[in-house]
Structures are given as structure tokens and as C-alpha cells.
Amino acid sequence: MTRPAAFGISFDSDRDQTSAAAAPYNSRDHLAVQDQRSRLPVHKHRKELLYLVEGHATTLVVGETGSGKTTQIPQYLHEAGWTGGGRMVACTQPRRVAAMTVAARVAEEVGTELGQQVGYSIRFEEVCTQGVTCIKYCTDGVLLREMMEDPLLSAYSVVMVDEAHERSLATDVLLGLLKKVQRQRPDLRVVISSATLQADKLAAFFDTTTVKGQGAGATGISKSPAIMSVEGRTHPVQQHYAESPVLDYVQAAVTTAVSIHEQDLPGDILIFLTGQEECEAAVTMLDEEARRFRRAQGNSLRLMPVALYAGLPAASQLQVFEMTPRGYRKVVAATNIAETSVTLEGVVYVVDSCFAKQQAYNPLTGLESLLVAPISKASAAQRAGRAGRVRPGFCFRLCTEQDFQALPDSSVPEMQRCELASTVLQLKAMGIDNIMKFEWLAPPPAETMVRALELLHALGALGDDARCQSCLWIPALLKLFLPLLGSWPVARRWSLLWPCSACTACGQEPMGSAKPTMKPNSGLLLEKAT
């Protein structure tokens, strides 16, 4: 078992003898909301940002963690008049909890009720008022579904794609579609922001100045993307590594958190694990430690373990962001949902397992898997940055420094490691018939694309010419079914049977060929083809 001595460090220099039980000091807590806004690093770049957005079709913002880009840029655009004429500013997030929490914060800063001038839209829930909402936070998947009804996004004047470095499937598809939309709508502005953005690659993707007839038009709008860097507000974070490889990273993470708690220093703890089962197991172990500490009564701070993962109900997710009661130390066991966008105030210590679950797809067998894999250095940097928001922090990585240096610099985009049948069908329904010529930020493997077309043809969704069958039905049916596909506990190919069978007037049970079986204690359904 890994004990604190495995890191070979001491917290004595960080100890505050006068207020051990106090919450971590945030120098901006006492300020009014508008004063807090003015002290964010992005505020000094406000005029520069608005100038770039005015003169360039695409603007790339490289903003470090804590710069305020997610909350402030949409407000700057609103204040500059980009929401005039009934249009909105959209800001996409890769996860629903980020869209909800950021929208709530921005509504507070604007001084309006959530759902009025500022709203959000996620799967199965929309808190907006038509004709009133000016700033809309949504997941990238929601905006993709809106494009099926309004391909040119006529309701928006600016679309901001946040956390683009995560390179999710929906984000990559959205970026490709936005590039197409800009050809038809020169007035549409696209702002792409991230903390670890590969700006040069994205700039080259959106640069159309080399395309014949795509230079600066009569309006004077430059087709060459502008790049702006914004410094962060993070405090220094000490990074520590295990002296030897860790056998059980869940147990090691709990042990490390307990050792931090025993030092009786202020500050919450954030543990990064890979999934729901691990988070719940860690919370159970921490609950046992909390009872032990209460019996011993040797610590002035009480442990308050909580979990944070995508499967939690929205209300439970939001509870994690509530202020930690005085006299308690919150320990959050989270998946990579806490890696970007969301801010857990009060976190001083990060315990990083250096693992995450990633989707993998083998086009030869047609099987998808959810694997536990090492994270990239870029993700590790994001996780460490969670510890430096309110004061100097500590990051404990449960791997040796040698193993950390062997990690890849960045993760493989989801586009290149997942099945694409539903994505291809969605693009076909939007009228993009020649998928092979669609401009991808990261082109998917040819074998994966061929497999997707074969599957859709076998299901009857595509004809021999690779065009949509019953083209009048598919867009409407996809709009109805796509919000449900991700929630059905079956493999993606079987969920596609429902809209496809409806389009082809199939009279048999569409799910008859898939007999789901329950895996004990997992809550997941595994496909079993007959």
C-alpha cells in the first residue's frame, strides 16, 4: 500500500498555524461580481478580442486555466452588440455539467434570472426563453442537432467552441460543419478557445485565403484566422511523483488523500479516477476513514467525500460545486469530467491516477470497447491546474516520473477511435452526400468510414449509391431519435436500428436481432448478437 512517505515530501512549510481549520483564502471572494470580472486576466484583452472578432471570420483564443475565457468572452460579445437583431451568442461545452454551471455563473454576473438573457441547453433539458435569451451555453451535441433543422445556424451571430482541445467526436464534426457554414454565411463569427489548444493546426484548418475566391470579400472580413493568447490566473503547483509503480491506484489515491488530511492543513482534495465504480469505491473507503477520524477526534477538519461523474443526475452534480462548510474538507472523487471547464473552488490538492477511460473501435471486427488507458501530458497538465486556482497547490501523480515522461503529448482524437455510423447518418441527413470529401480536422481511418457505410447500407438507411433512403423521413426521425441514442443501454449500431427500421417501414421488431444481457453489478447492457 502506498503511504505518504512514498512521495517523500513534507507540508510543514505550507502550514498556517493560526487558522488550520479555515477555508483556503481567495483574495477575490469579498469583491463585488463586476470587480471580480475586471480582475480576470482576459479583461485586459477585451478590446483586442472584439477587434479581432470584428475583422476575422475565425478567432482562436489560447487561454490558460483561470483566465475567464469561458464566462467573459460571450459577455463581451453581447455587450458589443453581437446579440442585436434577435440573434444569440452560442458557447458550446463538451459536457452538460459545464454548460449548466457556467450558465448559472454568467447569469449571476449579468444580473438576470437563469433562462432569461442567459440560458443553457443540454440533452433533455433547455432553460432558455425564445426572443429573450442572448447568451446560450449548450453541449456541442445539442448544437449539432439544431443544425439538422437550421443548417446555417441563422439564430446565431457568433458560435464559440470552448475546450476544443478535448477533440471529442461532436466537437470535431461541429468544427468541420462551421467551416462549411462560413462559406454560405460570411457574417457568422467562430471563436475557438482552449487552454492547451494546438493553434497552428486549427488556424491552418480554417484558413481559406489560399482557396480561389475565398480571400477577404467586399465586407473586408479576413478569412485568415486570428490567434490571441491570454495568460492564466493560476498559482504555482508543486508536482510530485510516486517513488515506485502503484499496483492499485484507487487504494493509493485514497491513502494519499488520507495522508493529506492527517496533516490538518486547509484545502479541498480532488482525486481523478476513471469511472463511476472507482469513484463510488473511493467515496466508500473515504467514508470509513471519516468515521475513524470522528472517533479519534484528532483532526480539526472533518472529511466530506463526494463523487462526480457523468452518470450522476444533474442535481447531484451541481451539489459538488457548493461551498464546503466551515470545519470540513471536501474530497471529490471524479472522472475527467472535472478536468476542464468546471471549477471546484477551494481545491488545493490534486491526486491524479494518470488514467482515464477511452473508447476504442476495431473496424475489422466491428467491436467497440471502453478501455482504461494512460492519459496524455496535456491532460495531466489540465488536472494539475485544478489545484492552483485559489492558492499555491500540490499535485500528486500516482506514477513514477519516468513513466510520466513516457506519456504521449496529446490524446488521439475520438474521431479516430470510435464507430462513425451514427455520425455518417447524421451528416447524410444534413445533405452532405459525399462524406469522403467532408473536411475533417482529424480524418478518420478509411477502414472505419467504409465499415460505417456498409453498416448503414445493411440496415437499409443507405441505398446502393450511398444516398439516404426515404430522404424525407430521415432528417425528421433523426431529430427525434438522436437525443435518445446515447441514453439507450445498447451498442450504437443497435440503437440505429430504430430510426432506420422506421424509414424503411420495417414490420419486424427492430431490436429482435440484439438480445441484451445484464452484466452483474455493472448496470451496463452488453450486446450479444445471435
Language-model features: locations:
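P-loop NTPase motor module signature
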Residues: M1-L480, G486-W488, C500-M511, K515-K528
